[in-house]
Amino acid sequence: MLVVAAMRVWNPEEGWANRVGRKREGKIVEILRRVTMTAHGLSHFPRQLLRMPRAALRKPNPALDLDSWLKTPEDLPATINSQTLFGNDQPLEIEVGSGKGLFIQTESDRRPEHNYFGIEIARKYAAHAAARLAKRERANAKMLAGDATPLFAVTDEGKRIEDGSLDGVHVYFPDPWWKKRHRKRRVLSHDNILNFSRCLRVGGRLHFWTDVLDYFELTVELIAEIAPELGVPLPETQRESTHDLDFHTHFERRSRKMGIPVYRVCYRKRS
């Protein structure tokens, strides 16, 4: 079977091939989704088939001063906590892979008594998220343009994030790294899971959402094996959105609008 999508061709043996045709994002996506699911007996539509053209990311307003909201690894203090980042002792939560920053913008407004630190490896997205915070003058949220893994890691120099110092770790729709040889790059890797757990306080929560069932199942199994202190996985229910930005993240909005199941789980550290 051969499926023609916007600017791309996909077949089950070779995946995406040469670009063809003209860009048509509406009906062609729905046809692709239904035909592929029916032909291959799929229960969900794989996200790797959704590499549709995206609108260009708007550059932040040059009039906005992002210094208070956008940090680089060089800007960070030796120890990362609420006191060193925000100058107070409010509970600190970290989002790994903030993307365009919808979650950190919404959650920092909803819970002003908590601090939020978003980490995004792609600088243009980190800047976009920081601009959202700057525009709204969020005093309890900041963005880092950088890699989260070195910040959570335990090295010969010590720990950047102390044991039991975080109230929450959020990982939403991380890159699934489809090829088996690349899976070690996943955010929820063996070492990262151990470090996320180490950094959480007792009662702190690890949130993980994805639209990739294989990633979800493997991660739940891995956590049960190596981090039993996180307890049993607690499902997080889907709520109905009331407007176009009433979603956890932009990825959740896209997946739900295209009818793709989203798998959600939360862990509460027991000891």
Swiss-Prot record:
Tree of life domain: Bacteria
EC number(s) from the headed UniProt entry: 2.1.1.33
Keywords, comma-separated and alphabetical: Methyltransferase, S-adenosyl-L-methionine, Transferase, tRNA processing
Residues involved in S-adenosyl-L-methionine binding: 95, 120, 147, 175
Binding positions (substrate): 179, 211, 249-252
Reaction catalysed by this enzyme: guanosine(46) in tRNA + S-adenosyl-L-methionine = N(7)-methylguanosine(46) in tRNA + S-adenosyl-L-homocysteine
Pfam families hit by this protein: Methyltransf_4
Alphabetical list of CDD domains matching this protein: AdoMet_MTases (cd02440)
Pathway(s) the chain acts in: tRNA modification; N(7)-methylguanine-tRNA biosynthesis
One example GO MF annotation: tRNA (guanine(46)-N7)-methyltransferase activity
Gene Ontology BP, a term: tRNA methylation
Catalytic site: 175
A cellular component annotation (GO) from this entry: tRNA methyltransferase complex
Family annotation (InterPro entries): SAM-dependent_MTases_sf, tRNA_(Gua-N-7)_MeTrfase_Trmb, tRNA_methyltr_TrmB_bact
Record-stated family: Belongs to the class I-like SAM-binding methyltransferase superfamily. TrmB family.
NCBIfam families: tRNA (guanosine(46)-N7)-methyltransferase TrmB (TIGR00091)
Protein's job: Catalyzes the formation of N(7)-methylguanine at position 46 (m7G46) in tRNA.
Annotated protein name in UniProt: tRNA (guanine-N(7)-)-methyltransferase
Protein source organism: Rhodopirellula baltica (strain DSM 10527 / NCIMB 13988 / SH1)
Gene name, Swiss-Prot/TrEMBL: trmB
